[in-house]
Amino acid sequence: MFDTSAGSVRPAECTGDGRVGLYVCGITPYDATHIGHASTYLAFDTLQRVWLDRGYDVAYVQNVTDVDDPLLERATATGVDWRDLAAEQVELFRTDMEALRILPPDSYVGVTEVVDEVASAVAELVRRGTAYPVATPDAVVAGAQDLYFDVARAGEDGPWALGDESGYDLDTMAALSAERGGDPERPGKRDPLDPLLWRAERAGEPAWDSVVGRGRPGWHIECAVIALRKLDRPVTVQGGGSDLIFPHHEMSAGHAAALTGEDFACVYAHSGMVAYQGEKMSKSLGNLVLVSRLRAAGVDPRAIRLALLAQHYRADWEWTDELLAESVARLAAWDAWAAAADASATAGADAGEPGELVQLVRERLSEDLDTPGAILLLDLRVATGVPATPVELAAVDALLGVRLGSPAA
């Protein structure tokens, strides 16, 4: 897979012992599930399928950011309790993922489930001198302070240094930090890019008692703690959308390295952004194409999946009605191919053994998850009119996640 930190393709494994760990940043549960979400989780579903096809022992963890400023703001704006909104949206997300046949992680972990563990990690960073307090006059408790991560100290003490993953310059980092939940202008910080580790309680906000005072976790430390708690070190692949490269993945890797003295992951992999009507699909813009609405309109989830697989996971691309129509037509052709399957057809191999087509699909997927290349191979085979063999249909199901012949599958 393409490793963002290296700027090149690297083996998606660490130890060579067949054990692999995948951590993918989950949703903040509001406005779920749009096509951009689905594209990201499908990318790492494909990785998981390739690993499983090779016989690897896969451990996959995904968090749910079930307490965060955007969620709280949406709950306040709509008059809904933030916990109810989170639960409703998580259930919708999981239903959409199941409809798209995206393999579930071994562990879904909500941030609210690990507040104590996060607080303990923050306390450890304070003890090591990698975290420091900042005056917080609007805290509920007089004298309570927010806690921040000292990026300079972390870079001096451990294997991580600011910019290792993203490769961005400081001006780009500052702009992205301000745009993506950071506070580079906050007085009292040692460095404008130092990220929040623990937010002291504010009036009207959820908070928990902890070893570092009453409050709630910062964004990046949540993922670091969950990954370290649930997966072997180092994580084989840390994944997410390319909008998470900085600050989220950069800083979560820094937090993990500061806690362990080791690199967080072997590969940092990122999916491209999806646009709609000329703009990046985003909650803030409201230009969302929701999987649930497509399903409610009668679109076969397999066609949605094929539309996503037709794009390389690292590419930025745009969702259009024409793209969906192409996938609907492709699915119809593939279904007809499956319906004409002849159990005695060998296509150059025994019907119970992988033939050339299956091997070629495996090769394409092994090259940085080249799903467009794999789909082209299937299109060419379907166009020949040669009936599918059972093993070929099983491979399409296992490797691409498309079960042919049944819209309900």
From Swiss-Prot:
* Cellular component GO terms, alphabetical: cytosol
Give the protein's recorded name.
L-cysteine:1D-myo-inositol 2-amino-2-deoxy-alpha-D-glucopyranoside ligase
Q: Which HAMAP family match?
A: MshC (MF_01697)
Q: How does it assemble?
A: Monomer.
- Name one matching Pfam family: tRNA-synt_1e
Q: List UniProt keywords, sorted A-Z.
A: ATP-binding, Ligase, Metal-binding, Nucleotide-binding, Zinc
Q: Which organism is it from?
A: Clavibacter sepedonicus (Clavibacter michiganensis subsp. sepedonicus)
Tell me the residue numbers annotated for binding Zn(2+): C25, C223, H248
